[in-house]
């Protein structure tokens, strides 16, 4: 157990610096905005939705069915909410456990010597694991790896006990159960069944390729083939259920996710897809350059035969074929330890375990599955079990390296990425085995101790360098800004775009704008980046430029509902109501089929309908507004916050004098969000209208309590008090409102009115002056300022404002009448003669 404990401890220690990290990249959608984690969402939704919370049968679903991983996120949320520390802790503990199990697997292959420990330490420290462990969504790969190893180890136990019916079949049942669990953590987990079959055929029974056919028809081998047949049948059942559950339809991805898959040129697709495994293997060999995302142009397409990367591809497949052939062809007589034979599965050579491949010479002529067969069953002496030969370990290592990678290879179906580092978590087990078995073979062949020591220390140095790289790379995953900055050299378009979002959230507006423009420099047709830049410009009142980028975003992706939404809002605010209406209508007609995030799309469509209803409402078309609001309610997704929509429904019914319906929707608004201030105010007005004055006052006071710094709340309460004849209280509320919202003309102007009604003319004058300053060319503001100055005896100032008001509105009868009265007073006081 020492090797397992040391390896697990290293796996734990190397990732301790991730515990203080934040949610990063895909964590946001899989955890922070995933409705399946919330307590109010039924538990069984996890088994019908994909990893991102989208219904699995939806055309826009990624078809990533990982319910056990999502369940673990939900448990994290249940006990710790959205505190990332808890999520990271689970990931680190899982990686430590996987490392221990992998080391235990190595013990079955290498014995209890140092090579087992080396393999375990290599796996614990390999930097390719940082995305899987440091990124919380990588838990899918780590968890799948845990159950993958449990399944494989159980099947190995089944092989060693075959013939003892009860224990043997218990082990194979456990292997099948853990395989299913592995697949339910992540899809590639099902490949453990194929790896188990490879172990049984080529490692446990040491069959060569030319021996497999000859043993199929021998009755004495029935138990062996029954085991392999069970693996095959269980795999078919799991895959069949998986395809059925996702609606028997493949996922769809955008061009940027996997450019080669979308390329129409067969040569380009073929060369690129053949090259990608080479690139993945290089990341395992030399994980110097890592990135959070390898999509878009991170790996340029190979378009011609003359591309120098094709040399890497050819070399890779030649070496792979030679390695597989040399391991499978095999002479039955191979020796690793100078012909020395193991006792109890071990032999010590200079303190390091190694083994012999000594087999009977007639093995090639008479292929036999078992060392001793009785009725087709292999019996074993558990005290004299030999360790697998080097060739056997290489075969198993290759199967661990290749088979779990096949689902990500684009061989059977296209995937939504070019390279994904976390996908290499399980294949890296095979890589670590290959490195270890290669180092061991060199160590055994080395004749001089100095060479042995050199090789040993070189291997130790590799582990140290891997560990240091892992710790440093973990630092990049500390927060999103560091992560995206680290990815600029690999995928500049994606990294700059995501960095822009982070900088914007930090209120670094100029830096964010620069980041968005850098992203568009590298890839000008990214709809999300065009939209994000437009949104940034809109929020900074650069409306014309914002409209330009929204138009480009919609041109790049015609289904971008959020682009239509914000375009419509700008047009509506600019008074271009007909253009806004057409924009909102077009948005509402966009279907959610084949969209990456259908829930976000539905939210944008619902918001478009809400704003279209508001547009009709402001134009007095209340019945049309209600029709649109009802459509919005039908289309809104679960995560949409409906309180504003319900409140506007109530407002429309109030304008149509359907008081009972209005009250229903006001209360629905408050049910959906009990602290929704507009609903408190509108419901308070309804209660006032229906004579429930005490109840109305409670709602107005509650609104003030919810937000004591919101002037509009004091103004509504002031109007209520004014209607109740409590004039001084009303004036005090109005004054408070104007002080809080001193830049809002309506609030300031109404406050001045209430203060004048309360005969607080000096205070009223102050706020009339403020209102006139806010709208300097508004005749009513100037006329009312003149009137209060008139009342306060400031006659010359009053005259000046009356005359300004008449310049703007010459035919205003009230202003003309007030001015004549003012002149009469001024004549009596000698301030003005009748000839002037």
Swiss-Prot record:
Intervals holding TPR repeats: 493-526, 527-560, 561-594, 606-639, 643-676, 677-710, 711-744, 745-778, 779-812
Ranges per topology, Cytoplasmic: 99-107, 154-164, 210-220, 334-392, 436-449
SUPFAM superfamilies according to UniProt: TPR-like (SSF48452)
Molecular-function annotations in GO: dolichyl-phosphate-mannose-protein mannosyltransferase activity; mannosyltransferase activity
Group of enzyme by EC: transferase
UniProtKB keywords: Endoplasmic reticulum, Membrane, Repeat, TPR repeat, Transferase, Transmembrane, Transmembrane helix
Compartmental location: Membrane; Endoplasmic reticulum
GO biological process: protein O-linked mannosylation
Catalysis: reaction(s): a di-trans,poly-cis-dolichyl beta-D-mannosyl phosphate + L-seryl-[protein] = 3-O-(alpha-D-mannosyl)-L-seryl-[protein] + a di-trans,poly-cis-dolichyl phosphate + H(+); a di-trans,poly-cis-dolichyl beta-D-mannosyl phosphate + L-threonyl-[protein] = 3-O-(alpha-D-mannosyl)-L-threonyl-[protein] + a di-trans,poly-cis-dolichyl phosphate + H(+)
TM segment ranges: 1-21, 78-98, 108-128, 133-153, 165-185, 189-209, 221-241, 313-333, 393-413, 415-435, 450-470
GO cellular component terms attached to this protein's record: endoplasmic reticulum membrane
Pathway in which the depicted protein is active: Protein modification; protein glycosylation
Pfam families from the UniProt entry: TMTC_DUF1736, TPR_1, TPR_12, TPR_16, TPR_8
Extracellular topology ranges: 22-77, 129-132, 186-188, 242-312, 414, 471-836
Record bears the keyword Transmembrane helix: yes
Topological type in the membrane: Multi-pass membrane protein
EC assignment: 2.4.1.109
UniProt keyword annotation of Cytoplasm present: no
Cited function: Transfers mannosyl residues to the hydroxyl group of serine or threonine residues.
Family to which this protein belongs: Belongs to the TMTC family.
Protein name as catalogued: Protein O-mannosyl-transferase tmtc2
Annotated source species: Xenopus laevis (African clawed frog)
Higher taxonomy: Eukaryota, Metazoa, Chordata, Craniata, Vertebrata
């Amino acid at each position: 157990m020492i090797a397992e404990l040391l390896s697990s401890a290293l796996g734990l220690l190397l990732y301790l610096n991730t515990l203080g990290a934040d949610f990063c990249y895909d964590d946001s959608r899989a955890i922070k905005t995933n409705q399946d984690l919330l307590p109010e969402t039924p538990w069984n939704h996890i088994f019908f939705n994909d990893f991102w919370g989208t219904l699995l049968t939806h055309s826009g679903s990624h078809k990533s069915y990982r319910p056990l991983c999502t369940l673990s996120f939900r448990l994290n949320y249940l006990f710790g909410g959205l505190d990332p520390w808890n999520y990271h802790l689970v990931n680190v503990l899982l990686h430590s456990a996987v490392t221990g199990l992998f080391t235990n697997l190595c013990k079955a292959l290498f014995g209890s010597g140092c090579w087992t420990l080396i393999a375990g330490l290599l796996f614990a420290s390999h930097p390719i694991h940082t995305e899987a462990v440091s990124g919380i969504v990588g838990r899918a790969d780590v968890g799948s790896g845990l159950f993958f190893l449990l399944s494989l180890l159980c099947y190995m136990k089944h092989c060693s006990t075959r013939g003892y019916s009860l224990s043997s079949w218990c082990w194979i049942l456990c292997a099948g159960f853990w395989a299913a669990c592995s697949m339910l953590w992540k899809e590639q987990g099902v490949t453990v069944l194929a790896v188990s079959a490879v172990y049984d055929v080529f490692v446990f029974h040491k069959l060569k390729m030319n021996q497999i056919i000859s043993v199929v028809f021998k009755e004495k081998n029935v138990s062996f083939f029954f085991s392999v047949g069970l693996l095959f049948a269980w795999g078919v059942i799991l895959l069949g259920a998986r395809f059925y559950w996702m609606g028997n339809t493949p996922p769809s991805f955008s061009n940027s996710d996997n450019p080669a898959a979308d390329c129409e040129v067969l040569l380009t697709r073929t060369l690129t897809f053949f090259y990608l495994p080479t690139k993945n293997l290089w990341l395992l060999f030399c994980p110097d350059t890592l990135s959070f995302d390898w999509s878009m142009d991170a790996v340029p397409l190979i378009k011609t035969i003359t591309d120098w990367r094709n040399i890497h591809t050819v070399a890779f497949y030649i070496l792979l074929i030679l390695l597989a052939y040399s391991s499978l062809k095999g002479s039955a007589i191979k020796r690793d330890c100078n012909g020395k034979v193991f006792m109890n599965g071990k032999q010590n050579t200079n303190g390091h375990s190694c083994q012999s491949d000594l087999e009977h010479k007639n093995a090639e002529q008479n292929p036999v599955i078992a060392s001793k067969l009785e009725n087709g069953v292999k019996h074993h002496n558990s005290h004299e079990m030999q360790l697998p030969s080097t060739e056997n370990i290489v075969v198993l290592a290759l199967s661990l390296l290749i088979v779990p990678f096949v689902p990500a290879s684009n061989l059977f179906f296209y995937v939504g990425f070019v390279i994904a580092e976390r996908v290499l978590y399980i294949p890296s087990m095979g890589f670590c085995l290959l490195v270890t078995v290669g180092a061991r073979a060199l160590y055994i062949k080395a004749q001089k101790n100095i060479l042995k020591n050199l090789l040993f220390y070189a291997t130790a140095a590799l582990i140290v360098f891997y560990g240091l790289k892992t710790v440093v790379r973990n630092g990049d995953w500390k927060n999103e800004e560091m992560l995206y900055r680290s990815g600029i050299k690999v995928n500049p378009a994606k990294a700059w775009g995501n960095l822009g979002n982070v900088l914007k959230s930090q209120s670094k507006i100029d830096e964010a704008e620069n980041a968005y423009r850098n992203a568009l420099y590298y890839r000008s047709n990214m709809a999300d980046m065009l939209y994000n830049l437009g949104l940034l410009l809109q929020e900074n009142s650069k409306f014309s430029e914002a409209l330009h980028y929204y138009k480009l975003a919609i041109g790049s992706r015609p289904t971008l509902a959020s682009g239509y939404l914000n375009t419509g809002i700008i047009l509506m605010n600019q008074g271009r109501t007909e253009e806004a209406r057409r924009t909102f209508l077009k948005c509402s007609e966009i279907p959610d089929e084949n969209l990456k995030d259908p829930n976000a799309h539905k939210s944008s469509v619902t918001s478009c309908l809400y704003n279209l209803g508001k547009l009709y409402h402001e134009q007095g078309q209340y019945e049309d507004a209600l029709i649109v609001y009802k459509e919005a309610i039908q289309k809104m997704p679960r995560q949409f916050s409906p309180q504003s929509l319900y409140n506007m429904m109530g407002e429309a019914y109030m304008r149509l004098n359907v008081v009972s319906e209005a009250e229903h929707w006001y209360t629905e608004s408050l049910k959906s969000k009990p602290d929704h201030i507009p609903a408190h105010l509108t419901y308070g007005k309804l209660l006032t209208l229906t004579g429930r004055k005490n109840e109305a006052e409670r709602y107005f006071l509650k609104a003030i309590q919810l937000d004591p710094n919101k002037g509009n709340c004091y103004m509504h309460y002031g109007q209520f008090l004014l209607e109740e004849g409590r004039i001084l209280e009303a004036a005090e509320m109005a004054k408070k409102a104007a002080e809080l919202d001193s830049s809002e003309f309506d609030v300031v102007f109404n406050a001045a009115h209430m203060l004048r009604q309360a005969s607080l003319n000096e205070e009223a004058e102050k706020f009339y002056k403020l209102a006139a300053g806010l709208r300097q060319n508004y005749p009513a503001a100037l006329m009312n300022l003149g009137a209060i100055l008139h009342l306060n005896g400031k006659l010359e100032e009053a005259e000046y404002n009356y005359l300004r008001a008449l310049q703007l509105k010459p035919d205003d009868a009230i202003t003309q009448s007030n001015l004549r009265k003012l002149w009469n007073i001024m004549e009596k006081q000698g301030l003005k003669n009748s000839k002037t």
